[in-house]
Amino acid sequence: MIDSIKQLLQQEAQAVLNIPVTDAYEKAVKLIVEQIHQKKGKLVTSGMGKAGQIAMNIATTFCSTGIPSVFLHPSEAQHGDLGILQKNDLLLLISNSGKTREIVELTRLSP
């Protein structure tokens, strides 16, 4: 059992190490630093289905590290929850296809 857990943790650590640090990744990190740390905005994550679960996990993980973050359900955003968005907030929208209707609509509705 201990060996299985150890192997799982090693696989997870390797997966993190395998994340490519590209120009786009560096730009995303700089944008987060600028909008959240310098301009005092918050990270607002959103996604539908499994992508929504991932977005929710990202928001809670960021919160636990002291980075203001909240999950916004894209369907609820269309029915009054857009009020959570404020100046300098940064939207992180997650979609497997990039064509999820609710996410596309959220980009149109966002201030």
Where are each of the predicted segments found?
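Glycine-rich phosphate-binding loops that contact phosphosugars or nucleotide phosphates
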Residues: 33, 42-111
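An N-terminal, well-structured beta->alpha segment
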Residues: 1-41
